Curated annotation (Swiss-Prot):
This is Large ribosomal subunit protein bL31. Belongs to the bacterial ribosomal protein bL31 family. Type A subfamily. Pfam families: Ribosomal_L31. Zn(2+) binds at C16, C18, C36, C39. Disulfide bonds: none annotated. Binds 1 zinc ion per subunit. Binds the 23S rRNA. GO terms for biological process: translation. The keyword Kinase does not apply. The gene is rpmE. Part of the 50S ribosomal subunit. InterPro entries: Ribosomal_bL28/bL31-like_sf, Ribosomal_bL31, Ribosomal_bL31_A, Ribosomal_bL31_sf. GO terms for cellular component: ribonucleoprotein complex; ribosome. The keyword Cell division does not apply.
Length: 65
């Protein structure tokens, strides 16, 4: 491999909009995210299960079947 052409991989701190901070490895100096595992609905258990239905359900609803 060639020397001095690869970016420096270092430990950085990730800042979430909810206020949570954690460390990870990256070539960037700082990372800011809007959603992390502490505030995402899937990981917190607050997700909503929305079922829209398919084409058949829309057809039946439209024509009163």
């Amino acid at each position: 491999m060639k020397k001095d052409i690869h970016p420096v991989y270092q430990e950085v701190e990730v800042h979430c909009a909810c206020g949570n901070n954690f460390k990870t490895g990256s070539t960037n100096k700082e990372i800011r995210v809007e959603i992390c595992s502490q505030c995402h609905p899937f990981f917190t258990g607050k997700q909503k299960n929305v079922e829209k239905g398919g084409r058949v359900e829309k057809f039946k609803k439209r024509f009163g079947m």
